[in-house]
Amino acid sequence: MKQTVSHAKRLRGAISVPGDKSISHRSVLFNALAEGNAEITGFLPGADCLSSIACLRQMGVEIEHSDDKVRVFGRGLRGLREPSDVLDCGNSGTTLRLLAGLLAGQPFLSVLTGDASLRSRPQKRIVEPLRQLGAKLDGRDNGNRAPLVIRGTTIHGGNYELPIASAQVKSALLLAGLTGDAPMRLSGKIVSRDHTERMLIAMGIDLTVKDDEIVLYPPSHPVFPYPLSLHVPGDPSSATFWWVAAAIHPDAEITTLGVGLNPSRTGALDVLKAMGADITISNERNEGAEPVGDVTVRGGGLRGTRIDGDLIPRLIDEIPVLAVAAACAVGETVVADAEELRAKETDRVATVVSELTAMGATLEATPDGMIIAGGGELQGAHVQSHGDHRIAMALAVAGLVAEGETIIDEAEAVTVSYPTFWQHYAQIKEA
């Protein structure tokens, strides 16, 4: 589908963004292992999260789903059934990587695959550490590409040092460790999204988290983990599109309601504040294990900044739209230490640089990020999402301040993480 967007005279509105994608995945995957039933509201009914539900159903988990409400009938830590067919994760890297950990210690064989994009993405980052724990995984390119074959076996505890800051790798290891024969200690680069740690602790798992290590004690009691009913907060990665839209527009005020403010996810807010954005956070509260609030951003001038180091794990998915903010800012912005961008749904360094260049921005790709000159005026153009949901939405935001019309190919990609994106897009322009 092609979507045509154009310059907006002003932007106004209050938006409830869909539920957090990371938490939605975990809410169904973890509750499938619980002894009992869980009610989940605010669930993101995007294509990726629906892939997690589909895979769990193939292993005997009963799940009722209607819009943003889900009920999971847990089967217990060792109650999953061997699937009779290949588990298709669609385009969802989270589904594949978390299931790889979850299934590593289950007493059966399983095969994980996905669409062409997912099958092309490297998987050694999870396969190698899981193998070190005793897991038996194989796949194309010596396990670096899906389909992945998992022969469930005994997972060994012990010490493992994480070489990269990745919530998916960390989560895969912790899920494998739930069925382990001894405690697991993770050290190294453990600072990344911590939804897994928060949720497992809330479900009664003996997990200790310190600045330099995470220690998991496999549950010895048969009723652990407990089921966890929860409301999923709004996704800060989705909210960032509206934060940037407001920040780059001279006549804008947009509020995102009920957004998750977990410190491991608020890197984009920190960057926008450093760039000079006018941001107000109100109605702060806790919902379950997660901090939540309302975020209002008003239009104003931005300046260039540097995005690197410990910031990267806190905003890796938001870099495409932050690049739009940087293109509209005064001065240079440097993105570094973000090699992971090249292993996403697309090579997001290459796609961001090519598509924003087509709109008149000045960018230079680097091995681990990009350099954005800033200061230019964006022009409408015919651009490609490359089937990547975050690229499609970033280009739509750029189109709000570009002169003339912008035509986005494969605009339907937004449904992966934000099924109502185009409705909300029209809403803020019409307000």
Curated annotation (Swiss-Prot):
Gene Ontology cellular component terms for the protein in this record: cytoplasm
Enzyme's top EC category: transferase
Disulfide feature: none
Pathway annotation: Metabolic intermediate biosynthesis; chorismate biosynthesis; chorismate from D-erythrose 4-phosphate and phosphoenolpyruvate: step 6/7
Provenance organism: Herpetosiphon aurantiacus (strain ATCC 23779 / DSM 785 / 114-95)
Family: Belongs to the EPSP synthase family.
Name of the protein in its database record: 3-phosphoshikimate 1-carboxyvinyltransferase
GO BP, one annotated term: chorismate biosynthetic process
Binding site for 3-phosphoshikimate: 21-22, 26, 166, 168, 192, 317, 344
